[in-house]
């Protein structure tokens, strides 16, 4: 027998941003499909029209593709199992709803929202789990409602929903690929609404039909869908379909182990993109929210292809995964340390162009926007920045004159003789050849030694005047990159602005 080609899906609702939990679900489905040489599909579940947000569908797919998760089939890419938007498949759901009605697995319900709420409150007072009281279950299906009443309501055009009839006193179970066997008692299962009064299906109904018709082999989704499983499995049974394999991913938790929510931090992938996190770090971080390669490995930084090669559902845990931003920050730094300079330049050049449009520079624009200059800045600052944009924003002194000097550092590092020493050393720098880190260091040491001074007496003031701050990369290499003209100009300006009383 030829094994069925693996097909997985990510099925978001177009209600806004892509949640980090949604990204993890999409990623795990993608990794599993690619590991198994199968297909990854995006389906848009827009049956709740009241929550639909304009452009959300395009933004979801765009964000996934930014992360390297490209679908084999989707509303954008097309495919043999379309349409891939549920609102374009309403005729399909109606057809299958009619089949369930005919087979007595579903029935019409005319209860008003007020009646449903009244029944719910009554059950809560009685200490019962709220569920539909089956007021409209017809006599021929074991209920109390005469068929004549139902026909009358239909003839009057009264609004209705269609509910599934959950069998009494049965056990529903399945084998979860992560959690093992899971069992449900049918007495806890409500007669789920399948078709709403607006003619749209509920998530539960449309999802099961589409998962079958689109021939998905594995459904990998969040733990929050686990309580819905018995309803879904019963629908598969009603239609006589073989259900796919299921895997329910662990919850994402805040550091205090509460459920991840916007109240305690950003939850939208777009928020992290705006802050400057790279797709490499975000994907790596999200992949490890529940999955690990296993004992015996210390690897924590993975390329996407490595994740595909090493991913398995057997290594996904059951316990909630803690969303630790510090770990994400650490990963971002690891990628910056090892990312090719050419790739970083592609990211920071637009950032630099934006800054140059807002601020004047005394440096040559052609020089500071060129590959050679940017490569030097990158190699000096790799260990010091947390985001790629900080090569420009955190290291602005490589591109713009310091607008001020760190006040506490000036107080600490300036003595009455500092400016005179700087003027005298400036004369050395004016004729220094070549103007390199090595020659600058040698010249400075040769300058202070006969005076019985330590190099620090000039190192710190030079750094403050050249950059405006008291910290940064190697002073000598920084001065070399800035170049003789900029260094002399900044020293002269600083001497004019900083004075210390005798």
Curated annotation (Swiss-Prot):
Keywords: Aminoacyl-tRNA synthetase, ATP-binding, Cytoplasm, Ligase, Nucleotide-binding, Protein biosynthesis. Its EC number is 6.1.1.17. A motif ('HIGH' region) lies at residues 12-22. GO terms for biological process: glutamyl-tRNA aminoacylation. ATP binds at residue 262. It catalyses: tRNA(Glu) + L-glutamate + ATP = L-glutamyl-tRNA(Glu) + AMP + diphosphate. Pfam families: Anticodon_2, tRNA-synt_1c. It comes from the Bacteria. One of its GO terms (molecular function) is zinc ion binding. The keyword Ligase applies. CDD domains: GluRS_core. A motif ('KMSKS' region) lies at residues 259-263. It is found in: Cytoplasm. InterPro entries: aa-tRNA-synth_I_cd-bd, aa-tRNA-synth_I_codon-bd_sub2, aa-tRNA-synth_I_CS, aa_tRNA-synth_I_cd-bd_sf, Glu-tRNA-ligase_bac/mito, Glu/Gln-tRNA-synth, Glu/Gln-tRNA-synth_Ib_cat-dom, GluQ/Sye. GO terms for cellular component: cytoplasm. Belongs to the class-I aminoacyl-tRNA synthetase family. Glutamate--tRNA ligase type 1 subfamily. PANTHER family: GLUTAMATE--TRNA LIGASE, GLUTAMATE--TRNA LIGASE, MITOCHONDRIAL-RELATED. Catalyzes the attachment of glutamate to tRNA(Glu) in a two-step reaction: glutamate is first activated by ATP to form Glu-AMP and then transferred to the acceptor end of tRNA(Glu). Monomer. This is Glutamate--tRNA ligase.
């Amino acid at each position: 027998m030829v094994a069925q080609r693996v097909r997985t899906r990510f099925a978001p609702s177009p209600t806004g941003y892509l949640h980090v939990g949604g990204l993890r679900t999409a990623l795990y489905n993608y990794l599993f499909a690619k590991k198994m040489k199968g297909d990854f599909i995006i389906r848009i579940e827009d049956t709740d029209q009241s929550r639909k947000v304009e452009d959300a569908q395009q933004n979801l797919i765009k964000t996934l593709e930014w992360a390297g998760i490209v679908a084999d089939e989707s509303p954008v890419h097309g495919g043999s199992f379309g349409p891939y938007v549920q609102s374009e498949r309403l005729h399909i759901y109606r057809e299958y709803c009619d089949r369930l009605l005919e087979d007595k697995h579903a029935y019409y319900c005319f209860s008003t929202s007020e009646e449903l709420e009244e029944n719910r409150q009554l059950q809560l007072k009685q200490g019962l789990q709220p569920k539909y009281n089956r007021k409209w279950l017809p006599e021929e299906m074991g209920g109390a409602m005469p068929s004549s009443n139902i026909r009358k309501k239909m003839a009057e055009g009264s609004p209705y929903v269609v509910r599934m009839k959950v069998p009494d006193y049965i056990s529903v179970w399945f084998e979860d690929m992560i959690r093992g066997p899971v069992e449900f008692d049918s007495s806890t299962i409500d007669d789920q609404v399948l078709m709403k009064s607006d003619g749209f299906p509920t998530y539960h109904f449309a999802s099961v039909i589409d998962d079958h018709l689109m021939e998905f082999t594995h459904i990998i989704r969040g733990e929050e869908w686990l309580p819905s499983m018995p309803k879904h499995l019963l629908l598969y049974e009603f239609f006589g379909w073989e259900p796919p394999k299921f895997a329910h991913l662990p919850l994402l938790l805040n550091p205090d182990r509460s459920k991840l929510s916007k109240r305690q931090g950003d939850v939208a992938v777009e928020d992290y993109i705006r802050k400057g996190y790279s797709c490499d770090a975000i994907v790596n971080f999200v992949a490890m929210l529940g999955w690990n390669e296993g004992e015996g490995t210390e690897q924590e930084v993975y390329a996407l292809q490595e994740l595909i090669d090493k991913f398995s559902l057997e290594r996904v845990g059951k316990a909630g995964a803690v969303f630790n931003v510090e770990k994400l920050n650490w990963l971002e730094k690891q990628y910056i340390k090892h990312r090719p300079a050419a790739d970083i330049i592609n990211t920071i050049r637009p950032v630099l162009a934006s800054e140059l449009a807002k601020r004047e520079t005394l440096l040559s624009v052609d020089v500071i926007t060129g590959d050679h200059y940017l490569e030097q800045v990158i190699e000096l600052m790799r260990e010091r920045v947390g985001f790629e944009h900080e090569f420009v924003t955190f290291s602005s002194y490589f591109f713009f004159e310091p607008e001020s000097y760190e006040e506490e550092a000036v107080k600490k590092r300036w003595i009455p003789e500092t400016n005179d020493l700087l003027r005298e050393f400036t004369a050395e720098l004016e004729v220094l050849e070549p103007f390199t880190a090595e020659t600058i260091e040698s010249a400075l040491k040769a300058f202070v030694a006969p005076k019985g001074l330590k190099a620090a007496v000039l190192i710190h003031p030079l750094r403050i005047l050249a950059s405006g701050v008291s910290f940064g990369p190697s002073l000598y290499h920084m001065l070399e990159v800035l170049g003789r003209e900029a260094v002399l100009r900044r020293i002269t300006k600083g001497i004019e602005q900083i004075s210390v009383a005798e």
